[in-house]
A protein has these predicted regions:
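Bacterial N-terminal signal peptides
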Residues: 8-17
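Gly/Pro-rich, tryptophan- and cysteine-flecked surface segments typical
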Residues: 21-314
Length: 314
């Protein structure tokens, strides 16, 4: 298959307006909330495979933007050359943060994946599907013993229009941090400003046993160990505490088996039910209809090679 890179400045990504899609419906802009290429505890080594699928009979042009963790990315973020996703193509980018991709050894963060608004002429109107495509990711740890096995976590692309704004709250259930399991909580932000999220930790009876505020950098990513120990089968709620009216964030959690190192992804369940009154905004009714989200200025990813990424080396 002949493939080319297109060069251009990207001004934004369309997020379909109107009634939100179901979490597993395709859309034109996604956030992969956690990507990695770094050593972990117990001799593990974490990597991310990213897959794109084009359901259309025409080429779709897609952008990838890596948002490193603990970083203010408002001034720019590593951006892959524009990808021409061929009709009905399944494009597998093995170890996307590896040396043939964003070359970010030792790094972790989130990734914006979206149909380029200029190259595709995406209309961004309610119900339009002309730029919809599929985004899937898997975070996995290589077997620390050097054997061929590996364990993977499913991290499907989260539809960008279904994130947490001032109108909704995210719940992540079945959270444990005890003798058997430990939990990490993370938040990715597609907001060009600092955002503070509040984390409420609830026990199984619904009591709030911990409340913590976390600043998230512009277009940034943060992940932390759950602060409340001795929790078994509880729930974490995350909502905006201090943010501009257009803010949108994407929480998630991972629960890790202490004995085996196996991790399970806990995807956020989004709802207006239970939203604290102080988190609501007089502008809330319009926030989820924002049709264009700005992306950070592109920084080069000079080693990014689709041809090299297409070959699995492990």
């Amino acid at each position: 298959m002949a493939r080319k890179f297109l060069v251009g400045v990207v001004l934004g990504a369309v997020i379909a307006a109107g009634a939100p899609a179901l979490a597993r419906e395709m859309t034109s802009a996604y956030v992969v909330t956690a990507v990695a290429n770094l050593p972990g505890a117990g001799g593990t080594d974490w990597h991310t495979d990213l897959t794109l699928y084009n359901p259309h009979s025409s080429v779709l042009y897609v952008k990838l933007v890596y948002l490193p963790t603990d970083t203010d990315n408002s001034g720019g973020a590593p951006t892959a050359p524009l990808i021409d996703l061929q009709p009905w193509e399944t494009l597998n980018l093995w170890d996307v943060l590896g040396p043939n991709g964003f070359d970010a050894r030792g790094g972790k963060g989130a990734m914006l994946v979206y149909a380029d608004t200029t190259a595709n002429s995406c209309p961004g109107t309610a119900g339009d599907t002309s730029c919809d495509f599929g985004v899937f990711a898997r975070n996995y740890t290589l077997d620390p013993s050097g054997a061929g096995g590996e364990f993977g976590q499913d991290f499907p692309g989260f539809p960008a229009n279904l994130g947490v704004d001032s109108t909704v709250i995210a719940y992540m259930p079945q959270i444990s941090d005890d003798g058997d399991f430990r939990t990490n909580v993370g938040v990715a932000s597609w907001t060009n400003a600092w955002v503070t999220v509040r984390e409420d930790v609830q026990d199984a009876a619904g009591n709030i046993v911990g409340r913590y505020d976390h600043p998230i950098p512009p277009n940034g990513h943060e992940q932390w160990r759950l602060e409340t120990r001795g929790l078994t089968g509880g729930t974490v709620a995350v909502y905006l505490q201090n943010a501009p009216n257009t803010a949108m964030v994407y929480p998630y959690a991972t629960v890790v088996n202490n004995a085996t190192g196996d991790a399970t992804t806990v995807e956020a369940q989004i709802t207006p039910v239970g939203l604290p009154g102080q988190a609501a905004s007089v502008h809330a009714a319009t926030v989820r209809r924002v049709a264009l989200r700005s992306v950070p200025p592109p920084l080069p990813a000079p080693r990014f090679s689709l041809a090299a990424l297409a070959h699995r080396t492990r």
